[in-house]
Amino acid sequence: MTDTQNRVAMGYIKGVFGIKGWLKIAANTEYSDSLLDYPEWHLVKDGKTISVTLEAGKVVNGELQVKFEGINDRDLAFSLRGYTIEIPREAFAPTEEDEYYWTDLVGMTVVNKDHTVLGKVSNLMETGANDVLMIDGEHGQILIPFVSQYIETVDTGSKTITADWGLDY
């Protein structure tokens, strides 16, 4: 797996703040300030990748703002607008047993107890009560709550999820 394939998009740079190189971030994480846990970021746009080091960060009125080493003025900061923020997957904190990062579930094949392939996980959605797998396959889109009542096993090695779910549900 190449370095690029092993990185996860975590948000993007949506604008600048002030004149000293601060940037506004749109985070694709549950808690926007969790991006501050990663000192090294990869910024990607139009096939170009820039590696940057986080100098400082803060949440102001619910908005994540960051400062990178070497980015000290508004013009240079503005040139980074629109870049996607990627973090190496191996930098993520380990999960507890039966806990998974969404990025690890996307792309997994979902089969039911009859070994019928339901499709692949294309995305997940948060409903408040629980997360829901969005599965795309030859049977159309299937939504399965990601709870133990329906999910029997998650095998990260074989990238397979076994669900107690019929085609007629």
Curated annotation (Swiss-Prot):
Asked if Nucleotide-binding is a keyword of the record, the answer is no
Keywords recorded for this protein, A-Z = Chaperone, Cytoplasm, Ribosome biogenesis, rRNA processing
The transmembrane segments are none
A single GO CC term for this protein reads: cytosol
Q: Where in the cell is it found?
A: Cytoplasm
- Main subcellular location: cytoplasm
Q: Which GO terms describe its biological process?
A: maturation of SSU-rRNA
Q: Which SUPFAM superfamilies match?
A: PRC-barrel domain, Translation proteins
Please report the stretch or stretches of sequence annotated as the PRC barrel domain.
97-169
Q: GO: which molecular function terms? A: ribosome binding
Q: Pfam families this protein is in?
A: PRC_RimM, RimM
Fill in the domain comment.
Answer: The PRC barrel domain binds ribosomal protein uS19.
Family affiliation: Belongs to the RimM family.
Cite the record's note on assembly.
Binds ribosomal protein uS19.
Function of the molecule: An accessory protein needed during the final step in the assembly of 30S ribosomal subunit, possibly for assembly of the head region. Essential for efficient processing of 16S rRNA. May be needed both before and after RbfA during the maturation of 16S rRNA. It has affinity for free ribosomal 30S subunits but not for 70S ribosomes.
What name goes with this protein?
Answer: Ribosome maturation factor RimM
What organism does the record attribute this protein to? Neisseria meningitidis serogroup B (strain ATCC BAA-335 / MC58)
